[in-house]
Amino acid sequence: MKFTNLTAKEFGAFTDSMPYSHFTQTVGHYELKLAEGYETHLVGIKNNNNEVIAACLLTAVPVMKVFKYFYSNRGPVIDYENQELVHFFFNELSKYVKKHRCLYLHIDPYLPYQYLNHDGEITGNAGNDWFFDKMSNLGFEHTGFHKGFDPVLQIRYHSVLDLKDKTADDIIKNMDGLRKRNTKKVKKNGVKVRYLSEEELPIFRSFMEDTSESKAFADRDDKFYYNRLKYYKERVLVPLAYINFDEYIKELNEERDILNKDLNKALKDIEKRPENKKAHNKRDNLQQQLDANEQKIEEGKRLQEEHGNELPISAGFFFINPFEVVYYAGGTSNAFRHFAGSYAVQWEMINYALNHGIDRYNFYGVSGKFTEDAEDAGVVKFKKGYNAEIIEYVGDFIKPINKPVYAAYTALKKVKDRIF
């Protein structure tokens, strides 16, 4: 085997064929980083048949003018069960970056550490404990099992729905009551989904602004989303949920006709048997449903007059690769949250994964705190409702390449942090 530079074609073909291949280890991300002006490297291992058996996208950033900080975002893509290959790769990678004036190397592999439920209870070990000792022996320092959302470090916990050998009906059956109701609600209430073009991205951004204001979280800027849509191409999808009022009002009218028919039947039952409590209760329940139905029809007609026949209500931003569909971000119009548009977006993309033979639907990051007062408690509850599981990853590893200078660099950084 040999450590070597890879072409974009070689890199892309290999990473597309592997499990635990993150969207930041794709040709789209490589082209994005080139366009942003980063120094980038595609490296990997080839076997004796000249076949790629490991690959990694690296970016390099200047440090202290003379040196560089090398980072592989969720890399490398490699068969982690082959410990000999892992050892060879990281050993050769260290030699490679040293030749390019590397001060230190930072990696955060897409490698599971353990599995949990959404209450934070450990349900299984991923069998990768050996990796920590291996990296230590290779000169890497583990930065710890951090929790929460960090502006620099990748999130260590993902909420993931396993789709392997499942049907859409299986997914619905495994949801909790609220998720089932809202998924069925959007299916019958005229909520449609289509995909936004680059020119329509401001619709998504407006929803993100609404959501970030109501939930008090910091969103990425416009450039982040536009650039990824541009360079990832078909590997990014932005589904939009919208109300088609013609269909919505038609369905409500059909529902009203059925309710009126049932109500008349209940009234006749009461005439025949005035003492029948069940008939009285049924009448009251049907009348409540009719009142709610009339309110929805009136609201639908009013909104149709104000906004036209189609009203955007929610949108999401998704990364796609053969390994997984990733729900990266999403937002909903605060004024029309009651239409449950986010459920239509999720259901559309779950079915996209099922229809394209993608076995993993990644709801993406959670803090890992699993408490009622955690900043993402509501999000965790939402994801839990789909019967997803939590995957905790091994975390971040740093290897000083030039040890004397790195020691001086970290000491200076600590002093600056104290001052500022």
Curated annotation (Swiss-Prot):
Alphabetically ordered keywords of this record: Acyltransferase, Antibiotic resistance, Cell shape, Cell wall biogenesis/degradation, Cytoplasm, Peptidoglycan synthesis, Transferase
GO MF term set: aminoacyltransferase activity; nucleotide binding
Quaternary assembly: Homodimer. Interacts with FemB.
Lineage top rank: taxon: Bacteria
Nucleotide-binding listed as a keyword: no
Catalysed reaction, written as an equation: beta-D-GlcNAc-(1->4)-Mur2Ac(oyl-L-Ala-D-isoglutaminyl-L-Lys-(N(6)-Gly)-D-Ala-D-Ala)-di-trans,octa-cis-undecaprenyl diphosphate + 2 glycyl-tRNA(Gly) = MurNAc-L-Ala-D-isoglutaminyl-L-Lys-(N(6)-tri-Gly)-D-Ala-D-Ala-diphospho-di-trans,octa-cis-undecaprenyl-GlcNAc + 2 tRNA(Gly) + 2 H(+)
UniProt family annotation: Belongs to the FemABX family.
GO biological process per UniProt: cell wall organization; peptidoglycan biosynthetic process; regulation of cell shape; response to antibiotic
EC numbers, comma separated: 2.3.2.17
Name of the protein described by the UniProt record: Aminoacyltransferase FemA
Localization (cell): Cytoplasm
Any Gene Ontology CC annotation: cytoplasm
Purpose: Catalyzes the formation of the pentaglycine interpeptide bridge, which is characteristic of the S.aureus peptidoglycan. Adds glycines 2 and 3 of the pentaglycine bridge, using glycyl-tRNA(Gly) as donor. Involved in resistance to methicillin.
Organism per entry: Staphylococcus aureus (strain MRSA252)
Pfam families registered for this protein in UniProt: FemAB
